[in-house]
């Protein structure tokens, strides 16, 4: 705020003039000095009033002449030369006063225009301040509250969605755990089935070895039977040869007993023994073969059942493996979705936090702007108050000057009469002019400092 200074100085009166009779007189002179300086928050005014004391002094706003001498006697004649000189001086002073009044009026009009302009600016600032207080803050507050509610709603939805996903994840984890336990049981059963199958295979191998051994024994028995048959046939041939030789010998020598029946009996006995041995061997072979076949059938049935169980277990394992893979894929998908949702929620929360920070910064900026407008408004109020004080001071000075200017015509005749009285009654008077300086400092419309100083400016000797 620029500092405005104004000063107003008025000087009235002139040097005392000697009349033709050689008497001396002192006219009263007055001097007013007003200065003001305005600063934001502090205003000071200084008013200097000095007057030269004489036998006739001014008192109060209406200027009246009062004499300290005894009442003057009316002279027989009036000195019109002195009155003419005083009238000329008064006219010159009136001309100067008129020019100064015109200048003062122009400055006063400029001050009034400036005050009006400042009042308009003040009204504009007050309107802007009211608008910012009424609409701007509430609108921003409503937007802020609405966005906060939306953020809270989305955050609640995200929390609920996260809880639901966690419940699904826990359920899937439980299902996966159950499937893993079931898979473990199936693997244990599979290992047991493989162990049983291995034992069955060992039994089958043993049965196969026993069957091969029995087959080898049957072959050896068959070979032995063939050998016995050959041996029996050979013995029969030998016996027949012996019998033929014995028949010949009997025929040649003597008649011997009949051996055909004996040979027949022996042959019959050997054939019976061979048939019995062959039947026993065949029965033993058949019984062993039947036992081995039954054992092989039993082992084959167990093997077939084991293979079927193994195939079933393999299919179940494949099914469970597929389900586990699907569960793993679903779990990974859910975990990926959950991570994406957490990242999205974190990003949205960061964006909302940035929005909240930006709104808070805007609110803080608007508060600072409101504070700045309030300070400017206070400064304008201080300037307006200082201008009002200065205008009031000018008004008082103008009223005082107008009331003082209305009396010079009447005072001239009085002064002329007093001069003639002084000629007839010389007086020795000592006059002293006193200078009063009063300084007042104000801030925010309150007086903070006030001081007064008295100075002896001039001493006058009146005879």
Swiss-Prot record:
InterPro entries assigned: IF_conserved, IF_rod_dom, Intermed_filament_DNA-bd, Intermediate_filament
SMART domains on file: Filament (SM01391)
Chain intervals for the UniProt region annotation (Linker 12): 240-262
Record site feature (Stutter), residues: 345
Keywords, comma-separated and alphabetical: Coiled coil, Intermediate filament
Region: Tail, residue numbers: 402-463
Region (Coil 2): 263-401
Region (Coil 1B): 148-239
Domain IF rod: residue ranges: 97-405
Assembly, per entry: Homomer.
Task performed by this protein: Vimentins are class-III intermediate filaments found in various non-epithelial cells, especially mesenchymal cells. Vimentin is attached to the nucleus, endoplasmic reticulum, and mitochondria, either laterally or terminally.
Family stated for the protein in its record: Belongs to the intermediate filament family.
Name of this chain's protein: Vimentin-4
Gene that specifies this protein: vim4
